[in-house]
């Protein structure tokens, strides 16, 4: 698998997990819908091969979750998000 496929797989796993999440807060649920839209935009950029080299940066998925305690408390979700951002930062410095 190439870097594009691996990265797309990680983002797809995040989306799949989001679909299984049961949250108590309506505000968090609404935010998660927007978050998923952003993840979908990233997947499209990967599929179109228009995603930029990371140059050591991250996609911001960790930051997008860190403001919501309910999302941070979900260990599986946190692991998926940090795994993706770390992979992009470290492995996708050039495609």
Task: Cite the ranges covered by each PLM segment.
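Amphipathic alpha-helical interaction modules
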Residues: 15-64
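Residue-level detector of solvent-exposed, low-hydrophobicity positions
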Residues: 11, 24, 38, 42-45, ...
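Short terminal alpha-helical segments
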Residues: 1-31, 85, 89-92
